[in-house]
């Protein structure tokens, strides 16, 4: 398995999970002139699985170009994207407090899917894998949702929650990959790195 990658992600959770795997990394982040929000725009009628694969592939190609432009030594590039889906509805990262409240009200008492796509590039090779997990939220009172949103934890996270944080108090069950729900499925990532 490759033990060094360029990580094209700002997520501290992805860094933590790579460290857990024993994979060294160097961050390969977008510059302010790159329109990363454009990459994450949902197309009309786009299914969650199609969306997460498309966004991850676009992020990967942008990161490979970034590596080339910066003339960095060649090494595998890794990126990932996580989306939360309730039915065909995609819940991205909340833009504000109202978004976070709406997302969490929607998820309260429901079981939803968390899809995390991870992709790697090495030379001309491109590999992608998707982890799909189910997360069940217990019914939450509005006061509990507001208190959680007030912590600031929902921001920057798909679906407005982080399973590894305070939201865990409201999650009654998960089925699938805990690390996939966090943002980088370790098993799938290791399998991809073995193939390079």
Located regions from the model:
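Generic enzyme active-site microenvironment
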Residues: 79
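Acidic/polar active-site rim loop that often engages polyanionic ligands
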Residues: 36-41, 86, 124-131
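Anionic-ligand binding region
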Residues: 101-107, 116-133
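N-terminal polybasic phosphate/anion-binding patch
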Residues: 1-76, 89, 195-196
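Short beta-strand and adjoining strand-loop segment in the mid-core
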Residues: 88-92, 119, 130-138
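Mobile beta-alpha loop/short-helix "lid" or hinge segments that flank ligand
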Residues: 24-36, 116-125, 156-168
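GST superfamily/GST-like fold recognition
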Residues: 2-23, 100, 110, 132-196
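Active-site-adjacent loop/tail segments of enzyme domains
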Residues: 82-112
